[in-house]
Amino acid sequence: MCRCPLEHHEGMMTSAEAVAVAGSAQEHGRPKWPPDKPQVLGQPAPARVVVAALVWLLAGASMSSLNKWIFTVHGFGRPLLLSALHMLAAALACHWGAQRPVPHSIHRRVLLLSLTFGTSMACGNVGLSTVPLDLAQLATTTTPLFTMALSALLLGRRHHPLQFAAMGPLCLGAACSLAGELRAPPAGCGFLLVATCLRGFKSVQQSGALLQEERLDTVTLLYATSLPSFCLLASAALVLEAGTAPPLPPTDSRLWACVLLSCFLSVVYNLASFSLLALTSALTVHVLGNLMVVGNLILSRLLFGSHLSALSYLGITLTLSGMFLYHNCELVASWATRWGLWNRDQPGKGL
């Protein structure tokens, strides 16, 4: 995770830290927020974060490649239907695990999150069905920039100056990669751009619902959002894909096995994503998500024979350098301080 001081990060705490702080405040008769030693309170969190991040990265990379395989090899021209099946699988999987009903006070926020959730998934799958997998993944590298801007505007979060600096190589790398892969249709790129923006907005919404006053658990929140999203996506698939998409082959067992596996990976991916948001932050999740891009580029080359240009490889290098700067901003700041390039007493003035 990012090694920035808490005061320069996003002003957020994990649920484990919040419970410990509340108990400490009751014992001493006065509130204490934030705690003096957050690293002690959050000792169980690192292992959980690592496990959730690994599961999230593996499930996400596998699901993207499998979805592209379904669209390309099996000719499954119904991305909205596939998105609806993903949401139906999430609702069925989380039905018995939801711990409590969603409070009435946040029903509107949950419905808005469901709308964003379903729309981002639909746009992502529609874009993935029309553009190469490598380009679809490279487009997602700009998600941290949207997430940082939205978290600052909507939630008033503060960020370390070097985190803002890290957005430069992240987005420049995405721009170079996209410029080197202009063979994709404009409509597909448009859907990917919309999906990227909505993904950042969705993460900010999820982070607020999970980590603020209601503190919903991941299974309950996924169940609450999956049902409205399924209704939205199923209706869209019925209206937009019923008469235009080719008929489904009912006897193609390999296709339906891939669809079932895709639904399973979607449930695992969403649960891991929600857990990461509860343990870290929306911005950290999307910066980590850029690791998924590298894995999908390798899979795209192996499975679909994609070949990247030199400009795209330059973009990958810039993206990885931006990720390093974001996650090691305190290390970079201490190195710059020794060389007289960074003044810790004036955090607003950077490199």
Swiss-Prot record:
It is a multi-pass membrane protein. Putative transporter. It comes from the Eukaryota. GO terms for cellular component: membrane. This is Solute carrier family 35 member E4. Pfam families: TPT (PF03151). Its main location: membrane. It is found in: Membrane. The gene is Slc35e4. Belongs to the TPT transporter family. SLC35E subfamily. The chain crosses the membrane at residues 40-60, 79-99, 110-130, 135-155, 162-182, 218-238, 258-278, 279-299, 301-321. Residues 125-179 form the EamA domain. Keywords: Membrane, Transmembrane, Transmembrane helix. InterPro entries: Sugar_P_trans_dom (IPR004853), TPT_transporter (IPR050186).
